[in-house]
C-alpha cells in the first residue's frame, strides 16, 4: 500500500483504532454493571469481586510497555489483531464457561494482557498514518 492510499484512508483508520479502544475499555465498564450478578451466580465475596475488577487493570498497566515493545518488534497490525482476538475470545469463553470467581479473575487478567497489546498498537498506527500537523487532533479524538 503506498503512502497516498494510507493518507487518504487515515480517518477511516482512526475510526477503526477508536473502535478497537472502545471494545477493550467496554470490557472494564461492563463488569462494573455485572458485579451483583457475578456475586450471586459465582458466590463471590467482596475480595473476589475486587480482584475481578482489578486483575484486568493490574495486568494491563504492568504489561503496557512490554506489549508496546512486542508490537514494535513483530508489527503494529499483528499486535492489534492479536490483542483484539485475545480480548474477544477470552470474553466469549468466560461468558460461556466460567463457573468460579477464579476462572473470571484469570480471564480478566488475560483480557488485560490483550488490551495491553491493543493500546500501544493503536497509538503507533495513528502516529504512522497521520502527518505531524494532524496527529494531535487524531490522538485527541
Where are these regions (language model features)?
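Transmembrane-helix bundle of Major Facilitator Superfamily
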Residues: 2-141
